[in-house]
Amino acid sequence: MKQKYWNINLEEMMEAGIHFGHQAAKWNPKMKPYIFTERRGIHILNVTKTARLLSEACDFVANAASKGKQFLIVGTKYQAADLVASAALKARCHYVNQKWLGGMLTNWSTIEKRLRKFEDLQTKKNMGALDELPKKEAANLERQLAQLQKYLGGIRYMTNLPDIVIIVDQQKELTAIRECINLNIPTICLVDTDCDPDLTDISIPANDDARASIRWVLDKLTSAIQEGRCNSTKI
């Protein structure tokens, strides 16, 4: 797929607060190439560089989507959880937005078993089978189902390991990143000024705390995924 313009507007980026980094004292020196200046003790990101890297990320996901690749979006911090879910549903991606369970990728066979249990319980509930059980037993199974829905609901239909993982907060999701590295799964990650860009395959320097910033970046990536799927070759 050719490189294209993804309607990445610098003024919109500034309005979303994408350029605001963390306190300068908390920075990671590896982020120096992406920092424009320091203002009142806060690092300011270079939005021109962010725009270029985001455009490259959009090209990458659009191309992957056109080939039928599957995506997982990860963001479990409270201000990102609902944004991750809505972005994933919009682009028909899998997602994790509550808690990353250790081994979710590296111990996939165990997760598959839990997903099968999830489906089994959901089917029984839908058929009314739980209503026929003693109240205590039914209540216990309802609690199990609620827990499975909370933590695995976003990957309920994920039948294999994802081809690409998009991560909202590197610091929060280090376990997920390490699992991707171990399995050679490409990652795209928002990296704030306290992050290590070397840990991810495609870094997008951006404010990873502000909801407006997270929403804006996810919107661009998921729009690119949608376009890639529309352009996929039908066999």
Swiss-Prot record:
A UniProt-annotated Pfam family: Ribosomal_S2
Alphabetized GO MF terms: structural constituent of ribosome
Gene3D superfamilies on file: Glucose-6-phosphate isomerase like protein, domain 1 (3.40.50.10490), Helix hairpin bin (1.10.287.610)
Location relative to the cell: Plastid, Chloroplast
CDD domains reported for this sequence: RPS2 (cd01425)
Any one cellular-component term (Gene Ontology): mitochondrial small ribosomal subunit
Primary location class: plastid
GO terms of biological process kind: translation
Record's keyword terms, sorted: Chloroplast, Plastid, Ribonucleoprotein, Ribosomal protein
PANTHER family in the cross-refs: 30S RIBOSOMAL PROTEIN S2 PROKARYOTIC AND ORGANELLAR, SMALL RIBOSOMAL SUBUNIT PROTEIN US2M
Entry similarity comment: Belongs to the universal ribosomal protein uS2 family.
NCBIfam families recorded: rpsB_bact
Name the UniProt record assigns to this protein: Small ribosomal subunit protein uS2c
Organism annotation: Anthoceros angustus
